Amino acid sequence: MTFRKSFDCYDFYDRAKVGEKCTQDDWDLMKIPMKAMELKQKYGLDFKGEFIPTDKDMMEKLFKAGFEMLLECGIYCTDTHRIVKYTEDEIWDAINNVQKEFVLGTGRDAVNVKKRSVGDKAKPIVQGGPTGSPISEDVFMPVHMSYALEKEVDTIVNGVMTSVRGKAPVPKSPYEVLAAKTETRLIKNACAMAGRPGMGVOGPETSLSAQGNISADCAGGMTCTDSHEVSQLNELKIDLDAISVIAHYKGNSDIIMDEQMPIFGGYAGGIEETTIVDVATHINAVIMSSASWHLDGPVHIRWGSTNTRETLTIAGWACATISEFTDILSGNQYYPCAGPCTEMCLLEASAQSITDTASGREILSGVASAKGVVTDKTTGMEARMMGEVARATAGVEISEVNVILDKLVALYEKNYASAPAGKTFQECYDVKTVTPTEEYMQVYDGARKKLEDLGLVF
């Protein structure tokens, strides 16, 4: 049966008021894991240890499983404790009418984001920045300037302000509103000081409420050529605050960046099951959020990292499948275990850059070093590595990529529990000149040499 009209956030709100009742425990502990397991068995999904898929028949089965996951489960609204269901025609309408390309930034600093494919020879867009990591107010500008100074970086992804005017940005307080506005204003000033005043940014990251996110669209702050973030909840869940934010973004004609990080070892379960949920989440981004692009980030439940063997496999298969069967634009965010100024951090980021570039990602977003939870532990050098590795990987045969990845991950995967803490931005850079220390440059060269030994050609 055909649909009455294209689905949007207003329809979501209406259905969230009348949908099937369900407790959150039943959703998290029964519906999601059981359906994911059922679909894995139904389609015989087995990735056989490949980071990037070479079996197109298996990719098609994965796409069908992800589509079916979304169709049969729907999305859980945490405010009303009800399930929002879509019809099959509504889902296909969203998939068939995605935003196929868009521009981030303005003037000579603008970049055109357009579809890539598995094994594409074109380098993906590099969105460099703290990626939601906490950054001290006194170094907020120089930290972001360290990314804008890197030519490998195309756009900026914001960090979180730990304070504004010396006060914590408490959700739903005046300070949250001030921080949401100040965050992007400072970053745009940092870009201007780096000689790139038209760079696009992605945020806001500091605010946690709808009023904070909405207030970031302001004079000198977020504009319609920036990526505006809204986050889905784990797994296949959302709250009504986010739906209100989507309504604002749509009404403002903003670029919408729908974000979600599926958890390996969490509610969905294992590798194949989590990838099914990841594919469903990508599709949900374009129907629920009217997303311009989806920011992925499979993360390991134990290590809090996106760079493990399991999470790279999930990311590689999900992206390749979405790229093969849809025009949905996709990015991935980076959370290494190790901190800045360490070889392990750079190698972790490199493994993910290789995976994302080869699997067809349009945007690489990072790097949130030290798992993105330690204040000031993120610098532009990690983004440089992400970009250089992406350039070296673009166009390499997938079979060769899988061999390189297997060897690369083996170099660091036994060290998660003892990952080096690394150094803060203030220890890695001259804060006044915003230049890396000699020590970090030597560490960088050492990591680059190891990548060359594995077969990457810079």
Swiss-Prot record:
Chain segments annotated as coiled-coil in the UniProt record: none
Catalytic activity, reaction form: Co(I)-[methylamine-specific corrinoid protein] + methylamine + H(+) = methyl-Co(III)-[methylamine-specific corrinoid protein] + NH4(+)
EC numbers: 2.1.1.248
InterPro entries, per the entry: MtmB_MeTrfase, MtmB_sf
Class of enzymatic activity (EC top level): transferase
Pathway of action: One-carbon metabolism; methanogenesis from methylamine
GO biological process: methanogenesis; methylation
Key word Methyltransferase present: yes
GO MF: monomethylamine methyltransferase activity
Keyword line: Methanogenesis, Methyltransferase, Pyrrolysine, Transferase
Summary of the function given for this chain in its UniProt record: Catalyzes the transfer of the methyl group from monomethylamine to the corrinoid cofactor of MtmC.
Family to which the UniProt record says this protein belongs: Belongs to the monomethylamine methyltransferase family.
Name the UniProt record assigns to this protein: Monomethylamine methyltransferase MtmB2
